[in-house]
Amino acid sequence: MAYSDGAVNKQQGDIMVKVALFVRLEAKPGKEKEVENFLLSGLPIVQAEPATTAWFGIRLGPSTFGIFDAFPDEAGRQAHLSGRVAAALMAKAGELLAKPPSIEKVDVLAAKLPG
């Protein structure tokens, strides 16, 4: 299968996501439900962030959770990292997590977004 020259990352309305974050969270024993609730409570906050194009709170295993979020550019990613959810995560990390969150900056090669 051949791909076009860069058009793979084009989404409807010319809105593109180019960069993302993948955050892995390991809950302390007995804190799994609290981590889940934390992720659920983060959704309304990120919905108010104009540069957060996509945001997912996910469960990877019984005590392993994650966040995947995507942005049109580095400025959007930095705004999110300086925002309320990131601040709340760092404030709760010692209480809820077995180790500090693993935050990976990633590049989005291709995406399909609703629209």
Predicted features and spans:
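Glycine-rich beta-strand-turn "strand-cap" elements at beta-sheet edges
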Residues: 2-17, 26, 53-63, 89-115
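Short, surface-exposed ligand-recognition loops at beta-strand->loop->(often short) alpha-helix junctions
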Residues: 26-35
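Hydrophobic core residues within well-ordered beta-strands of beta-rich domains
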Residues: 19-21
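Short phosphate-engaging motifs
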Residues: 31, 63, 76
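An amphipathic, aromatic/His-enriched active-site/gating alpha helix that lines ligand/cofactor pockets
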Residues: 41-54, 70-104
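Short hydrophobic/aromatic beta-strand micro-patches
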Residues: 24-26, 68-70
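Short, solvent-exposed alpha-helical surface patches in well-structured domains
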Residues: 34-37, 79
